[in-house]
């Protein structure tokens, strides 16, 4: 069983948990207390010198960056390739959505909310505009689409639903974006591990209360 270093509230960690559920892989979950500096201990730095979560250790093979872990789990353990198809064009669209999630959507969350939550900084209106812009892009991607990349659930949906649900508990109005809202309501029903994802979201919500 693969060791999985994580925090339940972390969106990237939740995307891996849902992907593991989708491919039927059990994870040996190991909570990492970042506030206590457990990620900076020599034994963890030996596993992941970047000292980030999530981190997976599968039979001695260490990997971090949630979207890389998602793809690895599907390629190694998926009974089919439906979550990450081998077709170059289908895979390219999924990759684009994953990179969009990492570099644009979730990045906008971090840039706007993290300074407020962790540094008690005032809200930055310019950073909020970046969130709105990211959601407008996602709304356009989802025009006429039930899923984020193609016509069935993929790792792109799983990564994006982890991010979008985090925006929801932060109080962002997802309903303003009709295509995103419709996709999100469907994703809640069809994504394996949604319940655990939402429990993690509610844990993260405490930072906003």
Swiss-Prot record:
Glutathione binds at residues 10, 51-53, 65-67. It catalyses: RX + glutathione = an S-substituted glutathione + a halide anion + H(+); 1,1,1-trichloro-2,2-bis(4-chlorophenyl)ethane = 1,1-dichloro-2,2-bis(4-chlorophenyl)ethylene + chloride + H(+). Residues 1-81 form the GST N-terminal domain. GO terms for molecular function: DDT-dehydrochlorinase activity; glutathione peroxidase activity; glutathione transferase activity. Its EC number is 2.5.1.18, 4.5.1.1. Homodimer. This is Glutathione S-transferase 1-1.
